[in-house]
A protein has these predicted regions:
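Structural signature of hydrophobic alpha-helical transmembrane segments
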Residues: 1-6, 57-65, 115-118, 180-183, ...
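Membrane-core helix-loop-helix motifs of multi-pass transport proteins
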Residues: 127-214, 221-225, 365-366, 375, ...
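Alpha-helical transmembrane segments of multi-pass membrane proteins
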Residues: 94-107, 132-152, 174-177, 183, ...
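Hydrophobic alpha-helical transmembrane segments
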Residues: 3-8, 26-29, 60, 95-102, ...
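Transmembrane alpha-helix interface/packing and boundary motifs in multi-pass membrane proteins
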Residues: 13-21, 70, 104-113, 144-151, ...
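Long, contiguous bundles of hydrophobic transmembrane helices that form the permeation core
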Residues: 6-9, 31, 38, 176, ...
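Structural signal for alpha-helical transmembrane segments and their membrane-water exit/capping regions
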Residues: 2-4, 12-44, 66-77, 198, ...
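Membrane-embedded alpha-helical segments and adjacent helix-loop junctions characteristic
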Residues: 42-130, 271-358
């Protein structure tokens, strides 16, 4: 009963959002609440919602200060020189621009933090996309796939870290076998970018494209950027922030809070101007925070009501007796839908240990289950429980339903390619 209700809840949510019957905010809250009432758990709704909010509150606060920090950096034109270098290198060719988006997305995803990655990529490329009329959903799709592939696979990215800790694995033993499939999947993303770039180039008016190329060649396309001491300070502060973030010197929230305060004092001295900056950037941050908190309601109800566990058990029951050798492959495929709908905590701490225990009965090492589980991160980055996704959607000014209509076909394709690469390289096995 709970499994059926859980799948029905997820299907209803997708239908309501993609058909635009409800906004993402209302759908992500109302569907699990209705399901909990139907399941007879209405009396426990308050506790389930609070448990869910407890898990996402730190993330919501982190996103607030990350948006404030990078919003300030954008107003200070920190990334403008990078944009100009990219534009000159691309020579105004949409194919090169879109492929460059994929390459930069893959590189910045190495820092492991989705919000940071999205804001850097959007800062560099979104002005170019808007100038040429390239669909910003192309940027969002590539950035999400890159983050899921790199940050979702690396031991320091957060998702795999959960699997390594809960299954008591060696990070080296887990990761060394994932480097090959991760690299091949990155190439697959670049191939998708090339195809999307060709498609976007065919949509752009030839005269408009030719005029833009002339502007680039003459230098008219660029605004002069004054590289004063504040520009160099901002660059050094941002670089230091990235280093401390990767080194895990302190919690991300603490790092962004301190960095924002320092940047605010250096770049804007007048108290009134500081307050105006916070008001402007808060307008971008607050909608993101609201959606993250709503996702916490979704996660709390789905997890504490037992629907997630029932769905996982139902999926496991599909594997016939004697087919234990295919559990790693089954885990990789199951990771795609579960990763899409579930929070990383719920998936890695709730589902993966059950799969690993089942695999152990057939002599399959837990490392393979962790690797298989990480493959679902590409679709996780496109799902409603991915907090950084709401930042990305805010930056490109897109609705969740529109994004998923565009992105899911490519996300599913690349995810299955990831499964195939993992099998070919021996990261997971079926023998």
């Amino acid at each position: 009963m709970l499994a059926v209700l859980g799948f029905a809840t997820l299907g209803s949510f997708m239908l309501l959002v993609m058909r635009k019957y409800l906004s993402a905010f209302t759908a992500i809250m109302l569907t699990p609440i209705a399901a909990a009432v139907i399941a007879g758990k209405g009396a426990k709704l308050g506790d389930m919602i609070m448990n869910g909010l407890d898990t996402v509150a730190p993330t919501a606060a982190l996103l607030l200060f990350a948006v404030l920090y990078f919003g300030l950096m954008m107003e200070c034109k920190l990334f403008e020189p990078i944009v100009q270098v990219i534009v000159r290198a691309s020579k105004g060719d949409p194919v090169r621009i879109v492929v460059g988006t994929a390459v930069l997305s893959l590189l910045v995803a190495l820092d492991g933090d989705g919000t940071t990655s999205y804001m850097i990529v959007c800062s560099a490329f979104l002005p170019i996309y808007r100038r040429l009329g390239i669909n910003p959903l192309v940027l969002a799709t590539l950035a999400a796939m890159a983050l899921g592939t790199i940050s979702g696979t690396t031991p320091w990215g957060g998702a795999a870290t959960r699997g390594i800790s809960v299954l008591h694995l060696s990070a080296t033993e887990y990761f060394v076998h994932m480097i090959g499939p991760m690299a091949l999947t990155s190439l697959a993303i670049i191939a998708v970018a090339y195809w999307l770039g060709l498609r976007e180039r065919s949509k752009i008016d030839a005269e408009k494209l030719a005029a833009y190329k002339l502007e680039i060649a003459s230098g008219e396309a660029f605004e002069p950027v004054k590289a004063d001491w504040r520009m160099w300070f901002n660059a050094a502060l941002t670089l230091l922030l990235m280093v401390l973030l990767i080194a895990e010197v302190a919690d991300l929230l603490v790092l962004f809070m301190v960095a924002f305060v320092i940047a605010l004092l250096v770049n804007i001295r007048a108290i009134g101007d500081q307050q105006d900056l916070i008001k402007r950037q808060a307008a971008n941050a607050v909608p993101v925070m609201i959606l993250v908190l709503a996702a916490g309601v979704f996660t709390g109800i789905m997890t504490d009501s037992g629907m997630i566990e029932a769905m996982a058990d139902a999926a496991l029951s599909i594997v016939p007796e004697g087919w234990g050798n295919v559990i790693p492959l089954f885990t990789a495929i199951l990771a795609l839908p579960l990763g899409f709908f579930m929070s990383n905590d719920g998936y890695w701490f709730g589902v993966v240990p059950v799969l690993a225990e089942s695999a152990a009965h057939y002599g399959i090492p837990a490392n393979e289950i962790a690797r298989a589980g990480a493959i679902g991160q590409i679709l996780h980055m496109m799902g409603p429980t991915s907090a950084p996704l709401w930042v990305l959607l805010g930056l490109v000014k897109a609705e969740l339903g529109d994004f998923q209509k565009h992105a899911l076909r490519w996300g599913v394709l690349v995810s299955f390619a990831y499964v195939a690469f993992a099998l070919l390289t021996g990261a997971i096995s079926i023998t």
